[in-house]
Amino acid sequence: MARKALIEKAKRTPKFKVRAYTRCVRCGRARSVYRFFGLCRICLRELAHKGQLPGVRKASW
């Protein structure tokens, strides 16, 4: 329940802009969230391995 409350709290518009922070839209994790996808590194990796993120490929150089 604590995570659910924090997710709802993050959705509200903060009194000051600097208080806004990103959360993973899938699991609610607050750390290491990629803004472009709105996902944390763990969810991003899982979805990329399944091929559910269009345009994402494994790097090779």
UniProtKB/Swiss-Prot annotation:
Name of the protein this chain belongs to: Small ribosomal subunit protein uS14
Task of the protein: Required for the assembly of 30S particles and may also be responsible for determining the conformation of the 16S rRNA at the A site. Binds 16S rRNA in center of the 30S subunit head.
Cofactors (names): Zn(2+)
Note describing how the cofactor binds: Binds 1 zinc ion per subunit.
One function term, GO molecular function aspect: structural constituent of ribosome
Complex and partners: Part of the 30S ribosomal subunit. Forms a tight complex with proteins S3 and S10, which cover it.
Family, as annotated: Belongs to the universal ribosomal protein uS14 family. Zinc-binding uS14 subfamily.
Entry GO terms, CC: cytoplasm; small ribosomal subunit
